[in-house]
């Protein structure tokens, strides 16, 4: 088993069979300004709080990988607070691994994977719940107590003339204006709280002429302006277009002041069709612009999917999605995390499943699989920061995506009468339709199988080259290595 750094005394381990390629454990960047801006947030974290928003699908809603990443950031850079929470019970869905939620009364809900619901606009958490009943409740119970601190608490709800009032209990303490400096705002309300927190109870109070209480989420942060706040804001089944439906998010985000946003979508964009939709690039660029309108200096990190199977067949659009995200990151001045190749690339999800790191659907990971992903996300941040410390003036750091024998570089768009593909090198704007090219599918000539070697303890490149009757330079070229440094578990292509 390969070990990663300690996570609160527990090693995150994984077998070499997962084919994890640590050459990709970086956030790729395309100019020095973005790298410097990224690194400066961590250099100043002891006096300027770093706020990260992580959007995605079901894995982010449950907080499996983000719990590991958050814990590592807090351990190294200090905790800026717990971050966002939502009452998933009222939305009839599963909760975070870090807390349970329950409700009393009747609640209706909307989620970002659905079409826009003008009657229930969506906020920063990607879900909204609403009740028309006085004395309805939203309850939260944390598995680990939020430690006593000078907390800033923000409740996001529709605070207008027809909203019910609210009683707020932290454990058994009723929050009040005098003791807790409770203030009302257009976004909801805020207050101070110093004690530890394990249970939160929101009780809807009657008010003359009130008609409903509409809840968007709550956030618990530390008052001190230091450390990392890591908000995990996923919605199961959400695709990239879901970001464009968060109509209340911009106003609420100005309260939380995000410095970085990780846009971790893709699976629900390509899974069922095995194709890149013609509108996807436009949706991604609009999502990027939506966050830059909130904070022009925000760091945006684009990611990829992992290897996927759907109904027993490989999802080959994963390659094109990886290349599309890399291309958009270059054009839009974003950072890029190539999880697809880091996680082993094509035809590896079956192995992840066999080793107990992916579920039987070969789409979702298991708990320990997501722990590995969260750990490698944190390590990718750290490796990028180390690169900056060693080479502060480096202009870019890119690692070409791997080529595979089943790689499909073009993206077929569904069309019953024409065989067309979208040229994903072209930028799709609101006014210019996507460029299409008529094609004749080429004959696929299978490439010979590549010989691979998994690095073991004590191995050096020269020893591996000698055993396989090749040279160090050829191995470095075949694997696009920048140095002769290798790590245990790394999979090397052995050239002839």
Ranges and model annotations:
Residues 423-424, 431-473, 477, 482-496:
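Primarily a LysM-type cell-wall glycan-binding module
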Residues 258-270, 278-294, 301-339:
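Conserved N-terminal glycine/acidic-rich loop preference
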Residues 11, 15-17, 84-151, 156-167, ...:
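Conserved catalytic region of serine esterases and O-acyltransferases that act on ester linkages
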